[in-house]
Amino acid sequence: MTEPSFNTSALIEESIKSAKINVGAKLVLAYSGGVDSEVLAQGLSLYAKSHPEFRYLLVHVHHGLSRNADAWVTHCQKQALDYQLPIEVVQVQVKTGPRLSIEAEARRARYKAITSLMDSADVLLTAHHLDDQLETVLLALKRGLGPKGLSAMGALQVFDGDKQLLRPLLNVSREQIEAKAASLSLPHIEDESNTDDKYDRNFLRLQIIPKLKSRWSAIATTASRSAALCAQQQAVIDDEVSARLPNFIELVPYGEGTALNLDLLSHQTPNWQALLLRGYIESSGFAPVSQIQLEQLLSQLLTAKPDANLEVRIADMLVRRFREKAYLSSYRPHKPKSLESIELTLESEVHFVQEINIPLLSNIRVEVLEDDGGERVRLPLIEEKVSVRFSAVGSLRCHPHNRQKGRELKKLWQEYGVPPWERERVPLIFYNEKLVCAVGYWVEHSFQSAEHETGLRFSIAIVSNECESI
């Protein structure tokens, strides 16, 4: 029988020290009640007794997938009482469907539920162990992943933007954990789905890994070492990509977005083209794309005709090409909603800062300023109604303050490099029926505030989270 040659609370302490956690932070344990999380919960209860400077919480997620799920809740609540640790039970609904992985969807729902109970300073602890790491490496190989995927799981990782995830048992084998539970007579649940090898991890755990271990007993340890080396190499790549990528990114002249300069990208080697595009996608908050998807996307972006307005959808990401630049946005299946004209009621006081909410888009910030070197619109006359509109006819003539002569609106959009899909989202300020300002771009020459004269400045103050649903 395997000896439980580890001290759980000591591993927790070592893990927490490496993370440099602030006093008062909450240590949140993902607690299923299985043998792995049971051992970690028992160790956390011992650690908590000597470390009152932290707060503690066990979180059990009820997935609703097993007829035994209610009994598991009862077990976890009883154990939490014995451990003298607070527990929160969260019930979730797991998406199911012919093209959905129950494993992946359950994991996604579980992490979403747990993170909803965490603040940015809090830390998540999970009971992943050495054999889980081997499974993750094998699955990465099956999927054809590179160094990033083969890095598998780290003992310390950042997730959900700014939260830390710790895996104190990552170098402990399943056999050691089971021996530990037996030595402490710890009760734990057995999830009946763990014996169903139609799930990839179960297939590896039940059919493949035992054979690998019978031939190479240390394979879990050596696979973990390879994962650590891949993580080390990936960190170097990530650092270099982070250093180079800003040279290829441009701020768009509207909103708060960016675009990738394809002309500059085309002068890089194929390997760097792929690394930089992947880095741009992931740094923009989108899920990693496969190697095949990346190669196809690169080919389409870099070989399209100069005047081509390419549009490619990958999962929930929409990639558009316009004037040698690539733009990323979230894909929404619904037809864009129309942005209606809104009449603005400006405050009567001359000196004010006012924000007018534009549903579905943003807030328009209106400032009354004396001469500050910027371009301003003269104050409206009593008989002039002020309104904000969208999608004015392209034949409308405008004379921007920074142009020698007037041109049709559709020509000005081209001159200013505004992509076609953004033109209907630019707020246009009207005095009665006269366009006086394209917010973020220009002030109409004949409505420009004179030097040393008080005027209005319009700007986009806040881009709402609903912006992409338009």
UniProtKB/Swiss-Prot annotation:
Gene Ontology terms, MF aspect: ATP binding; tRNA(Ile)-lysidine synthase activity
One GO-annotated biological process of the protein: tRNA modification
InterPro entries per UniProt: Lysidine-tRNA-synth_C (IPR012796), Rossmann-like_a/b/a_fold (IPR014729), TilS/TtcA_N (IPR011063), tRNA_Ile_lys_synt (IPR012094), tRNA_Ile_lys_synt_N (IPR012795), tRNA_Ile_lys_synt_subst-bd (IPR015262)
GO CC annotations, alphabetized: cytoplasm
Catalytic reactions of this protein: cytidine(34) in tRNA(Ile2) + L-lysine + ATP = lysidine(34) in tRNA(Ile2) + AMP + diphosphate + H(+)
The protein's Enzyme Commission number: 6.3.4.19
Enzymatic class: ligase
Signal peptide (UniProt feature, chain positions): none
Database matches in SMART domains: TilS_C (SM00977)
Cellular compartment(s): Cytoplasm
Cystine bridges: none
Pfam family for this entry, one: TilS
Protein family according to the UniProt entry: Belongs to the tRNA(Ile)-lysidine synthase family.
Record remark on domains: The N-terminal region contains the highly conserved SGGXDS motif, predicted to be a P-loop motif involved in ATP binding.
HAMAP family assigned: tRNA_Ile_lys_synt
Its job: Ligates lysine onto the cytidine present at position 34 of the AUA codon-specific tRNA(Ile) that contains the anticodon CAU, in an ATP-dependent manner. Cytidine is converted to lysidine, thus changing the amino acid specificity of the tRNA from methionine to isoleucine.
Protein's UniProt name: tRNA(Ile)-lysidine synthase
Organism: Shewanella woodyi (strain ATCC 51908 / MS32)
Originating gene: tilS
